[in-house]
Amino acid sequence: MKLLLLNILLLCCLADKLNEFSADIDYYDLGIMSRGKNAGSWYHSYEHQYDVFYYLAMQPWRHFVWTTCTTTDGNKECYKYTINEDHNVKVEDINKTDIKQDFCQKEYAYPIEKYEVDWDNVPVDEQRIESVDINGKTCFKYAAKRPLAYVYLNTKMTYATKTEAYDVCRMDFIGGRSITFRSFNTENKAFIDQYNTNTTSKCLLKVYDNNVNTHLAIIFGITDSTVIKSLQENLSLLSQLKTVKGVTLYYLKDDTYFTVNITLDQLKYDTLVKYTAGTGQVDPLINIAKNDLATKVADKSKDKNANDKIKRGTMIVLMDTALGSEFNAETEFDRKNISVHTVVLNRNKDPKITRSALRLVSLGPHYHEFTGNDEVNATITALFKGIRANLTERCDRDKCSGFCDAMNRCTCPMCCENDCFYTSCDVETGSCIPWPKAKPKAKKECPATCVGSYECKDLEGCVVTKYNDTCQPKVKCMVPYCDNDKNLTEVCKQKANCEADQKPSSDGYCWSYTCDQTTGFCKKDKRGKEMCTGKTNNCQEYVCDSEQRCSVRDKVCVKTSPYIEMSCYVAKCNLNTGMCENRLSCDTYSSCGGDSTGSVCKCDSTTGNKCQCNKVKNGNYCNSKNHEICDYTGTTPQCKVSNCTEDLVRDGCLIKRCNETSKTTYWENVDCSNTKIEFAKDDKSETMCKQYYSTTCLNGKCVVQAVGDVSNVGCGYCSMGTDNIITYHDDCNSRKSQCGNFNGKCIKGNDNSYSCVFEKDKTSSKSDNDICAECSSLTCPADTTYRTYTYDSKTGTCKATVQPTPACSVCESGKFVEKCKDQKLERKVTLEDGKEYKYNIPKDCVNEQCIPRTYIDCLGNDDNFKSIYNFYLPCQAYVTATYHYSSLFNLTSYKLHLPQSEEFMKEADKEAYCTYEITTRECKTCSLIETREKVQEVDLCAEETKNGGVPFKCKNNNCIIDPNFDCQPIECKIQEIVITEKDGIKTTTCKNTTKTTCDTNNKRIEDARKAFIEGKEGIEQVECASTVCQNDNSCPIITDVEKCNQNTEVDYGCKAMTGECDGTTYLCKFVQLTDDPSLDSEHFRTKSGVELNNACLKYKCVESKGSDGKITHKWEIDTERSNANPKPRNPCETATCNQTTGETIYTKKTCTVSEEFPTITPNQGRCFYCQCSYLDGSSVLTMYGETDKEYYDLDACGNCRVWNQTDRTQQLNNHTECILAGEINNVGAIAAATTVAVVVVAVVVALIVVSIGLFKTYQLVSSAMKNAITITNENAEYVGADNEATNAATFNG
C-alpha cells in the first residue's frame, strides 16, 4: 500500500528578524516558541513520489527530511534521508538500506513525526469524500492514522486515483487540536529537482565553509568570584571559530572603561585572567562595542583584502546585574549586522535581569542564563554553537521579501498570514500575494458602529479609521463604547481602559489602576491590604483577584508539542528550576550518584505503549513518591527522606541545606576557618607576610589567597609557590619607581617596620607635575590647568587632582582646546529698508556636540542682534521674529543628555536662522518713514482719515469709514460732505471724490515692492496679492497663493517658485536652483532627461539668455561629481555604478578554457586553466603547477600528462600517443626545461619544423606559449593552482 508520508520537523529555536512571521500554526504555537515563529513549505515530486515539508524560518539551521520510494522488479523500497546542509556527507557514502541513518550534526537535529493517510477508511467513491471550505479554498477530508484524526487536502482522490499534485490544508489531531496551513504554495517541480541536484549531492564535510568573517567583542560584566575562573577557562572554546578576524575585550575599572585587542589564539585562560571586571552596569560598554563593531562592518575600504572584510559583528555580553537602559535590538544591532549574545548569571532568577538582557537579542538562540558554577561549561558550549550557527551566510535582508532556504535562495513562508484577506505564496519572488490574485477574497469584514468607521489592518484586525462626534478618546487610557453598537446615532461614552494586576507588582502588592486624565497613562489606584507571602517552593506562584487580594497557587503546567497527544507524558513543574517540563508519567526516579545519570523510562511499542521505568545497573536512585531527595553535600551522594523537595547540592562555595520545619531550602557558606596557612622556614616570611594572607572558598574548595597588595611588603614582596608555601623576598634595591624611574631604598621606621621608598634624585630639577605627566594615563596629562600631581615616594607613584575639563574640548599640543568656545554662525538678512543687516547665532556645546543655540531671541538687545533691534525699536510690537531650527532636532535626546543624530549635525548650521515679518494689529503697523532710513509706528486709520478727508475707524483690524459718518462710500469710492447755506438754512449733501478706501493699501504694496526691487537686477516679479473692495467700505489686501504654484510652461531660469506668497512685498517667493533637480518641476526635469533615482548621476543647473532677452534653463550632468562611467582598476575587471548607492562595483572577468579555446580537447586542457591577463585583459592559458598528489607536463605533441607525484611512472589521465616525424625529438629539451615558457617554446619549435598540420595541438601550444610569456613578464616566479580539485574542475571540456 502506498503511504502518504508527511514528515514534519518540530523545531523550537529563535528566528531571524527577517523570518519573524505571525504564527499561523494553531496547534504548535501554544506559546511564543522561544520568541520565534513556525514557518515552512510543502513541495512534492510527481515522478519520484516523495514529499518534503521543511522549515525555512529557522535558518541558519538548514534541516529537513526526504522520504523517497522506488520500485524495482515489483519490489517497493522507501528511504528516509535527514539532511542538514551545514554538515552533509558524500552521497555515495550513504547506506540506503539503513533507514535509521541520520547524518546531520547532532546538535542541530530535531524530533521527527510521521503522519499517514488511512486509505482503508477513505471512501472508494469520490462523490462521498466530504468537501470543506478552509481559508476560502475548497479542500477535501481524509481519514488519517494516529495521532491524526483527519487530514485535509486540496485535491479530491481515492486510493486508486491518488495523485501527487496536492497541497495540505489542515491536520486534525485526536483531541480536537489542529494545524491549519493558511496559504498555499505554487507547485514547482524545478525547485525540487534543483534542490536535489545542488544540495543533496554536495559532499563537503566542513562546518565552517559557509561562515562569514566576524569581529568578536566580549564585554566582561560578571563580578561573582565563584564563577569567574570557570568562565575564563571555558571561553577558550570560542577560539575554534575560524572566521573570527579579531577579538576586543571591554571591562570596567572604577569609573573608567578599558579595551584590549587580542588575537583569536590568545582567547584562553592565561590571557583572560589578567583582566578583572569592576562592578557597575555594562550599558556604556555595550554602546562603545556597538559603535566599534558597526564601524568595522561598514568599512568598505577598496584597499582591504576581501578575505579580511568583516560581514557581521558579534558581541558577547557577560552580565549579572540588570541594565540601566533599554535597547532596541532590531534598530541598534540587527540592522547594523551585529549579533548580540548574552550570558547572564542570575542566581535568584530575578525577572528584571532576564527582561533587560532579552532586550539585547533578537536573532537566533542568543540568550543563555545560568544560576551557578556547575552550569558554566554547558552555557558556554551553547553560546559557541549559537555563534557558529549565526555566522552562516544569509540572504540580503534588505532585498529579500521572504527568507532564506538552505541554498540561500529567497522564498516565502508557509504561513503568509494576513488577518484581512487570503493569501498564496509565490515561490519565485519570495513574497506572499493576495488570493485569488484577480480579486482577493476578504477574510474579515469591519461594519461601522456608533463609535465610528472601521477598516481591517493586518495583525491588528478591525481598527477605527474615523471616530464619530464625541467618540474620540481624550487620552490614551480611555476607550469609547456604546450600550448598543448597532445604534449608529447613539452618543458615545468613555471608560477607563486599565486592567488590574493579575500577578503582584514589583513591590509585592496587588494593585488596581485608574486612568490619569492629565498624562493619559494608567496610574496605581487601590493597593491590596497585605503583601504577597507564603510561597514554599519554586512551583508555586502568587496571583491577584479582583479585590486585590493575594493568594498562592500551584503552577499549572500544560503539555507542549510534540507531547500533547502522547498519553504517556505529563506536564510537571521542576521544583529545582520552577519551570514546566514534559516528562514520562511513570518517571518518579532521579539519579543520586552511582554509575548512571538517570533511569531508563520508555513508552513505545516495546512496552505496549505503556509507561515503564527500569533502573540501570550500578545506579543510585531516589524515589519522589517516597519523599526522597538526594544529598550531595557529604562525601558520597545518598538518598534521604525529607520535607524539602529540592536536592541538597553544592554550588561553588555555597551549600544548600533543608529547614525541615518550614519545608524550605536555604544556602550557607562553606566554612574554611580550619584550613592551615604555611610559611617558609626562615626568620622573615611568617612575620612579614602573615597579615596579607587568609583562607577563603574558591570554586567549592578552601584555598589560601592574598587579601592585600603582596607586591609591596616591607622592602620586598610575598609570593606563594606551587607547593602553597608562602615566602618573603627582599628586592627593594633592584626596584625602580613606576613614575620617574627612581631607585628603591629600604628604610626602617620608628615602629621598627621596614618599607621600600623611591625618593626623587636630588640632582633632578623636574617638578612633580613634570614627573607624573610622563606616566599618567589621563587625557592631556601635561595640562596643569586641569591636572595637578603629587609624587608619593612611598609607593613610587603619583596622585592626581583632576578638575572638570571643558566641554567639547580636544587635546592639542598638550593642552585642552575648547572647540565650541566663542563659535558663532554669521548670518545676513535684508530688512524693509532694502539694506543687509548682519547678526550672529552662537553655538553651544551640548552633550559633547557643537550645535547652534537651541533658543534665541531674534529681537534681543545684545551684541548678536543690536543693529536689527535698533532698526525695529520704534515699533517692535508689530514685528514677528521667528527662529528657524532644524526639524531633525530630537528634544527627548536633548533632555536625556544623549547626542543628536548624524543627519541633524549635517544640516544644523544651515537650518539655523531668523526671519522677520511686519504684521498689523488693531490697524497699527510698522512702516518706513519717507527718507526710508528707519521705521516708525503708523496708525493706518489716522493715515486714511488724513488722506481721505473723512473719519476712519478700526474694525476687525481693517480701517473703515466711521459708520456714523453721513456720507458712506459707494463701491469703496470716498464721498465728502458738502454743506450749503441758503437763506440761513444749512443743507448737507454727499459729493464723490477721486479717492478710494483702497488707496492706502495700494500705496503700501507699491512701496514694499519698490523697496524690495530697488538696486537689484534679475528679480522675478510675480504678483500674488491685490486690494479687494468689500461691503462698499473695507478694502483689505487679499493674497492668492495659487499664483505662486510653478507653471510647467513658464521658465524663470535657475529659479523655481516655492508655492508661498511673501507677506511684505506680496510677490511670489523663489528658490535658487543649483545642483538639486528635485526642487524643480517635473516638466523641466523630464525635458532635460533627469534621472532622480540614479545616484550615479549628479546635475547642475545651466541658465541661458536668448536674443529676445528671454531666460531659460536646463539640467546638465555634472561630470566632475557624477560616477556614471567608473573606470576599472585593471584590465581584468569591469566597473559599474550602483544606481541606488552611487558606489562603484568592481567585478572580476572570468573565462573558461572550453569557450575561449574551443578546439582544445579535454585531455589537452587537463594541464591548463583559463585566466585573464593583467597586461591587456585578454584570455590566456595557464599551466597548472605541481600539487602534493599530481605532477604535470606535456609530451612532444603538446598532449597533457598527469603523473602521480609519489610515483611519476604512473600516469593518472588517459594516455595519448604522440606521432611526429622521426627526425624530430625534443623530449630532451622538454625534460631539461625549467619553466612553462621553455617547455611550450620547445614544443612549438618542434611542431613548426615538422609542420605536420596538427592544428589543434598547435593552437594549444601556441596559446600556451603566449600565456607562458605573459606570465613570465608579470611574475618571474610562476605559481600554479593550489590543488588537484581545482585542476579537475576548472576545465569545462
Curated annotation (Swiss-Prot):
Post-translational changes noted in the entry: N-glycosylated.
Signal peptide start and end residues: 1-15
Annotated glycosylation sites: 95, 198, 234, 261, 337, 377, 390, 468, 487, 643, 659, 890, 992, 1138, 1204, 1214
Protein name in UniProt: Galactose/N-acetyl-D-galactosamine lectin heavy subunit 1
Assembly and interaction partners: Heterodimer composed of a 170 kDa heavy subunit (hgl) and a 31/35 kDa light subunit (lgl); disulfide-linked.
Principal localisation: membrane
Keyword hit for Protein transport: no
UniProt record, GO biological process: cell adhesion
GO molecular function, one term: carbohydrate binding
Chain's gene name: hgl1
Annotated transmembrane regions: 1235-1255
UniProt key word Phosphoprotein: no
Keywords recorded for this protein, A-Z: Cell adhesion, Cell membrane, Disulfide bond, Glycoprotein, Lectin, Membrane, Signal, Transmembrane, Transmembrane helix
Compartments in which it is found: Cell membrane
Record membrane topology: Single-pass type I membrane protein
Cytoplasmic compartment residues: 1256-1293
Originating species: Entamoeba histolytica (strain ATCC 30459 / HM-1:IMSS / ABRM)
GO cellular component: plasma membrane
Extracellular side of membrane: 16-1234
Physiological role: Lectin which binds galactose and N-acetyl-D-galactosamine of host glycoproteins and thus mediates adhesion to host cells. Mediates adherence to host colonic mucins, an essential step for pathogenic tissue invasion.
